[in-house]
């Protein structure tokens, strides 16, 4: 029977916390900006880790690419600091990827809000009372 909460999940969760602290306190590169670690996926053998990040201030594709490139350039430095912070025999090799789920979630939320607003406007523009509906059904 498989464990409900595996070691890789625990390591990924701890890595997410530690990398977030490192990005906040140690990385001074202005290209990174306001980076947030949204998730970490660790391979089963703990050799590789994919770190998903979002950038709060950067909206353009070029800014995002620059930020991810800067993080990838700093991966060795982050790896060494992570090794000092965590008690692992082998610290996973880090790769950084942009997580667009926050942007997609905001886009979907805006679409839903637009539909609700359009529906309210349509209902207020053409009031139909109950007697009109009954006449149409007959």
From Swiss-Prot:
Which GO BP terms, alphabetically? Answer: maturation of SSU-rRNA
Per the UniProt entry, the disulfide pairs are none
Keyword Mitochondrion listed? The answer is no
Q: Can you state the subunit structure given in the record?
A: Monomer. Binds 30S ribosomal subunits, but not 50S ribosomal subunits or 70S ribosomes.
Family annotation (NCBIfam families): rbfA
| Family of the protein in this entry | Belongs to the RbfA family.
HAMAP family hit by this protein: RbfA
Explain the purpose of this protein: One of several proteins that assist in the late maturation steps of the functional core of the 30S ribosomal subunit. Associates with free 30S ribosomal subunits (but not with 30S subunits that are part of 70S ribosomes or polysomes). Required for efficient processing of 16S rRNA. May interact with the 5'-terminal helix region of 16S rRNA.
Return the protein name.
Ribosome-binding factor A
Gene for this chain: rbfA
